[in-house]
Amino acid sequence: MKKGTLVSVVLLLAAVSLGYAQEPGPGGLHGSVDVTYLSKYVWRGFDIYNDKSAIQPSVNLDLGGGVGASVMGHRANSSGYEDGERWDYYLHYSNAINPGEKNAVNYRIGYVYYNYPDMSSSIADLQELHAILSFPNILPVKGLVPTYVLVKLWPSESGSMVGCKSPAGGTASGFAHIFMLDYGIPVQGMGTGSPEQVINLHSEVVFNDGVGPNGANVDQDWSNAVFGISTTFDLGGNFSLTPGVYHQVTMDKSVNPDNDETWASVSATYKF
């Protein structure tokens, strides 16, 4: 019943979004509807579905004034992982300081509620606050952008099984620090009516402050580094397709005992 309600919310948001998209006035609602397939789902170093593929539907809304909201689901394509299905409810505010200047800062402040619909909210649900700071012009190489992300995660309820009294001896409460470097390389467009597209090179390294989202006993250490490449193909009619390949170097066995991970993804997106 709980799962059905959540799916209904996503479908309703998608229907409303597409309804607005029929006549997208300058002041109307804007955003995107997206479905992503992943050959495996790795989240902040953790292999969530034990090397199984996953599907991620989402609806993203631009509410204006820098405010945005989204709903994203995560579900394994194999049976046996129903308890690991997760829905993320995300509200955020984005803006910029000194745009166009060398010391420009693009920032986002966000709140996420992580809900596991097949489990009680008192067992596994999580909440998160994060701040994202990007510096688009600080480096002399055009398109090379460093980003820092500060994450604070905590159990939705104080008596949660993933809280400070987790049977596994760990906690889902604490901080993570993520350092990213992205490089966009413009190339001749390969999509419909697109004269140019961008090859995106992504890298990140994560310092985990001892946070296990499932209450696992996780070390306070540099946990993992990720390297990836992706690009977006313009299919016309506001549709696009984004394939990507990623590789994780695991530095902390308490986060991922399977050593390194490699996976692919493909996203189909409609913007309105």
What are these regions (language model features)?
Residues 38-44, 72-80, 96-100, 112-120, ...:
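Sequence/structural signature of outer-membrane beta-barrel proteins
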Residues 27-29, 51-55, 83-87, 105, ...:
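Residues that define the transmembrane beta-barrel architecture of outer-membrane proteins
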Residues 50-109, 113, 138-140, 144-146, ...:
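Glycine- and aromatic-enriched membrane insertion/assembly motifs of diderm outer-membrane
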Residues 35-37, 57-63, 89-95, 111, ...:
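Residues on the lipid-exposed face of transmembrane beta-strands in outer-membrane beta-barrel proteins
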Residues 22-30, 66, 96-106, 121-122, ...:
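Short loop/turn motifs that connect adjacent beta-strands in outer-membrane beta-barrel proteins
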Residues 1-30:
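Cleavable N-terminal export/targeting peptides
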Residues 22-77, 263:
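Short glycine/proline- and aromatic-enriched beta-strand/turn motifs that initiate or cap beta-hairpins
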Residues 126-218, 222-225, 247, 270:
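Detector for outer-membrane/organellar transmembrane beta-barrel domains
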